[in-house]
A protein has these predicted regions:
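Short catalytic/ligand-binding loop motif for oxyanion handling, primarily in non-cytosolic enzymes
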Residues: 13-16, 20-21, 91, 100-104, ...
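Acidic, Mg2+-coordinating phosphoryl-transfer loop and its flanking beta/alpha structural elements
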Residues: 145-189, 212
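Short acidic-hydrophobic, aromatic-tinged amphipathic segments that line or gate anion-handling sites
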Residues: 127-132, 183-192
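Substrate-recognition element of Asp-dependent hydrolases with the DxDx(T/V) motif
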Residues: 66-71, 75-109, 113, 130
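Internal alpha/beta domain cores that form substrate/cofactor-binding pockets in large enzymes
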Residues: 92, 127-129, 159-176, 193-208
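Substrate-recognition "cap/lid" segment bordering the active-site pocket of phosphatases
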Residues: 98-147, 153, 157, 235
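Non-catalytic pre-domain segments flanking phosphatase-related domains
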Residues: 1-6, 19, 25, 209-213, ...
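Active-site neighborhood of HAD-like aspartate-dependent phosphohydrolases
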Residues: 1-57
């Protein structure tokens, strides 16, 4: 049996498409439908911090906004097939989402997951919501979750620093994390799930440093502090970041 944590937005759900829709609902045709951010903060979008704040304000006022996200069909399909053909695994869908009008984030996520046809079958599947991605590592450590996948490189590095047991954290390749020097990467959720089946992680540390600076990422406390400091700046508020 394995305990596995899977991020939702950027792994199962297409947040980018939904956020583009929110932008264009305020400023028609501001972003092309096929726009792809090249970093977490959407700096190539041309949106100012004030404009991003305005988009988030509208999202937060939209009832049950999280229910409207499209799924990454390949990843959702891979998870559905994996759960249908495996037994006795604990799968946690862990997401950091801003609070919006309507149902709670957890309930919206639960309804969305069911609408995608995801069923645990002979496994257990639960939902965990956190207010910020930098809290995921604490949750995983407390629950002794052994495997995780995320599209945010800081979260993957932080989870890789869990010291009380061997946690195997992987980064799902996306355009907004391509410059992060994270060794444990996969191209698809299916690739990650096959690693869970194998039971072995890639050798070596999760990462060494981020390409844009000297934030070391190894196994010492200074790395954890540096990662937390970065998350405090970038992930502290939805208005500064693409996502919490």
């Amino acid at each position: 049996m394995a305990k596995v944590a899977i991020d939702v937005d950027g792994v199962l759900a297409d947040f980018t498409k939904a956020f583009i829709g929110a932008v264009n609902s305020i400023w028609p045709a501001r972003l092309k439908p096929d726009f792809v951010p090249t970093d977490w903060d959407w700096t190539n979008s041309g949106l100012t911090h004030g404009e991003i704040s305005k988009v988030w304000w509208k999202i937060k006022k939209t009832s049950n906004w999280w229910l409207g996200l499209d799924a990454y069909s390949d990843n959702v399909g891979a998870l559905a097939m994996w759960m249908a053909s495996r037994t006795d695994h604990d799968i946690w869908l862990c997401t950091s989402r801003a609070v919006v009008a309507g149902l709670t984030c957890a309930k919206q996520t639960d309804i969305w997951v069911q609408s995608c046809g995801l069923r645990p079958v002979n496994n257990f599947m639960g939902i965990i919501t956190v207010t910020n991605g930098n809290k995921k590592s604490m949750v995983y450590e407390a629950a002794e979750i052994e495997w995780s996948i995320d599209d945010k490189w800081e979260t993957v590095i932080d989870c890789g620093l869990i010291g009380s047991f061997e946690h195997k954290a992987y980064l799902l390749n996306q355009t907004w994390n391509k410059d992060a020097s994270v060794y444990r990467r996969v191209n698809t959720l299916e690739d990650f799930l096959l690693k869970v089946d194998d039971g072995k992680a890639n050798a070596g540390p999760v990462a060494v440093r981020h390409a844009s600076g000297d934030r070391a990422a190894g196994v010492d406390q200074s790395a954890r502090n540096l990662t937390a400091a970065h998350q405090g700046r970038v992930g502290e508020t939805s208005e500064r970041s693409r996502r919490p």
